[in-house]
């Protein structure tokens, strides 16, 4: 439906759209596996009307903020890292190295969940946000600025950001599930509901919260590249966007500690 092939200065043709075809057999395989191997859980079905009440809970929006800072950072950095590196270090062929960041972040997500199950999601998330703020601060020192900068330092620090964004995605996801389940059970018990009612409503509310929060977290895929682009267009440097990210991560440290770290969510 779009342009089929783009002619390069040397006369050759590059067809980027063909790269997407590699996913076709994998998608077909996943479709067949899902059709024959997955089953719906009848007890977990809920209408949109049943799910909307979670939007009234303050924890829904606080946890959305934290998930935006982790998962949103992961997909946002994945989208904007190559562009940022190319503008700051044009002599480096970043296309050969850019994929390592998303790869590290994707692997780290599962480890974030595993570690959180053992040490607690709040503790892991808190430490993770401190590290994300630290890496963002270190990133300022690697940029060209008045000197030539250091691509090696820039790359290593950014890999640290990918790692922590991935770990945080797993730990905040674990937090959401644990916190909303307990909140719902406590709420049902307070109004005199049975254990069965509490468990059923907890499943519905937790699933709804995870769905809404995941959608909000995906905004980072747009916001971060846009922030870098706007900062570069206005000032010629990504420093403005990075300052915003640094402050954002510090705010997330405070929210995690003050709301969930010092006392039980209630």
Model-found features: residue ranges?
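A membrane-interface helix-boundary motif in multi-pass transporters
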Residues: 2-24, 227-249
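C-terminal transmembrane helical hairpin of 12-TM major facilitator-type secondary transporters
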Residues: 122-172
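A late C-terminal transmembrane helix in Major Facilitator Superfamily
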Residues: 190-234
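Extracytoplasmic gate region of multi-pass secondary transporters
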Residues: 57-106, 169, 173-174, 224-225
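Juxtamembrane intracellular "pre-TM" segments in multi-pass secondary transporters
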Residues: 39-64
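Intracellular juxtamembrane helix-capping segments at the cytosolic ends
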Residues: 167-197
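C-terminal membrane-cytosol helix-exit motif in multi-pass small-molecule transporters
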Residues: 2-6, 19-44, 255-259
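Helix-to-loop junctions at the C-terminal end of transmembrane segments
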Residues: 109-121
